[in-house]
């Protein structure tokens, strides 16, 4: 009997090992096939194990100095501080999975995006990216319109690179945390000021930057609540620039601006409620918000099953020319010898310039163009001919100023019809006679979408800005003047 049990146990063990080997072989083959199919650049360091990255961080001398300083200032033992550091490392460090990113993630992303949007990807000059050196350190910097941005940009660039994003705490919930980490993203506590945490985060960001991991940074540090571009945050980019203390990295570093816009942002009403709550208006409780989300999901599921589903218009991405950082480092040769406040001031200037480049690349989709015309006219009833004329005037002005107008060759009536369907669906605009009535309860949505392109509108910008129905944001946008650098 005992011999039979041992034979059975051995057979199970051999079968388990064989199955594990087979699964491993299948995953490796799937990963290789995915890379060959997309011909994307996947940084070697991205495939390093979490254990090896953790060991490098725990043996980092700068983190060791931060541990001793924290222990001295808080009267906590160094052992307890090291334990906290280990928790931070486990929280931050991802585990990239090629199969998850390309075989699973790409297909799901493509299906979801095609379900909700018609996706447009435009390159300022595609050949510039092909000419980047293989050992270049590339950081994609972008504006932040929606939480769908992560999926949209990853999908748009899947044939070129696999991006590691800095993701906020909102995604640290099952299963989002596991998904983002499998895709190589790392988590950031946006408003956490503890120096020890930032020492760990800085060293991790610099470690992956030195190793050539391609990163994506939302330069505004969070979603725009009023539709305008926000002033840039410098923290993560300052960490990235820190590797240039070694001058051999300076010629290899590039920033690539990316601009994003939508005909409909999925969470626009939630963002407007957050903006209103800052002005003292009551914000719905968690149960009310959950009820609204469930209603939204149920309503759209019913529309999908009834075959009455309609997409939410365009989701557009413009990829700009790579910006080499070597000239900037040459012009700021004393950067790393300056006191920290002065150094951060120089970094802020760089971020402002990059944000201006992003602003100039923002795609103009039909709904923002129509909303800008509606807000510019500022009427409760707008004759169709008047609205079309103003949209055409704005489009011509945008093209003269090198604006990225999506499908600008179309007749303006075709562009408006695409916007009108969405505005009707959102209960913003209702047809009446030979024109349209603007419904007052959704006037804020008009401003939200008009604000996304207001800075591009040249002679029309001042009137659009003056009729904004949204409360002024704390910390004015760098584009509030309407000027594009």
Role assignments for model-derived ranges:
Residues 1-485:
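Membrane-interfacial terminal anchoring regions of lipid-handling membrane enzymes
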């Amino acid at each position: 009997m005992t011999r039979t049990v041992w034979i059975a146990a051995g057979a199970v063990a051999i079968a388990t090992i064989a199955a594990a080997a087979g699964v491993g072989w299948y995953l490796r083959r799937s990963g290789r096939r995915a890379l060959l199919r997309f011909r994307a650049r996947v940084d070697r360091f991205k495939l390093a194990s979490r254990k090896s990255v953790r060991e490098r961080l725990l043996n980092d001398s700068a983190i060791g100095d931060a541990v001793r300083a924290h222990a001295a200032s808080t009267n906590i033992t160094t052992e307890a501080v090291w334990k906290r550091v280990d928790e931070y490392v486990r929280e931050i460090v991802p585990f990239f999975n090629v199969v998850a990113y390309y075989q699973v993630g790409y297909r799901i992303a493509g299906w979801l995006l095609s379900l909700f949007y018609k996706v447009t990807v435009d390159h300022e000059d595609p050949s510039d990216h092909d000419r980047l050196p293989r050992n270049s350190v590339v950081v994609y910097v972008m504006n932040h319109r929606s939480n769908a941005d992560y999926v949209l940009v990853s999908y748009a660039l899947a044939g070129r690179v696999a991006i590691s994003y800095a993701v906020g705490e909102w995604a640290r919930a099952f299963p989002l945390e596991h998904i983002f980490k499998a895709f190589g993203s790392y988590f950031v506590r946006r408003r956490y000021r503890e120096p020890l945490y930032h020492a760990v985060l800085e060293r991790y960001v610099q470690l992956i930057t030195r190793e050539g991991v391609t990163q994506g940074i939302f330069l505004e540090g969070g979603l725009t609540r009023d539709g305008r571009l926000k002033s840039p945050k410098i923290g993560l980019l300052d960490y990235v620039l820190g590797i240039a203390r070694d001058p051999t990295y300076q010629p290899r570093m590039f920033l690539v601006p990316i601009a994003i816009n939508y005909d409909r942002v999925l969470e626009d009403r939630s963002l407007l409620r957050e903006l209103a709550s800052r002005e003292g208006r009551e914000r719905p409780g968690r149960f009310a918000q959950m009820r609204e989300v469930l209603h939204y999901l149920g309503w759209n599921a019913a529309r999908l099953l009834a075959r009455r589903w309609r997409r939410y218009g365009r989701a557009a991405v413009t990829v700009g020319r790579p910006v080499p950082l070597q000239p900037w480092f040459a012009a700021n040769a004393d950067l790393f010898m300056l006191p920290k406040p002065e150094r951060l001031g120089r970094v802020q200037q760089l971020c402002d310039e990059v944000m201006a480049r992003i602003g100039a690349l923002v795609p103009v989709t039909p709904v923002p163009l129509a909303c800008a015309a509606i807000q510019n006219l500022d009427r409760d009833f707008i004759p169709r001919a008047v609205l079309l004329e103003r949209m055409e005037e704005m489009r011509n002005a945008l093209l003269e100023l090198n604006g990225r107008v999506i499908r600008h060759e179309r007749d303006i009536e075709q562009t408006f019809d695409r916007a009108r369907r969405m505005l009707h669906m959102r209960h913003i605009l209702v047809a009446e006679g030979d024109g349209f009535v603007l419904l007052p309860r959704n006037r804020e949505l008009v401003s939200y979408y008009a604000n996304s392109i207001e800075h591009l509108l040249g002679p029309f910008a001042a009137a659009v800005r003056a009729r904004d129905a949204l409360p002024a944001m704390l910390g004015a946008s760098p584009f509030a003047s309407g000027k594009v650098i």
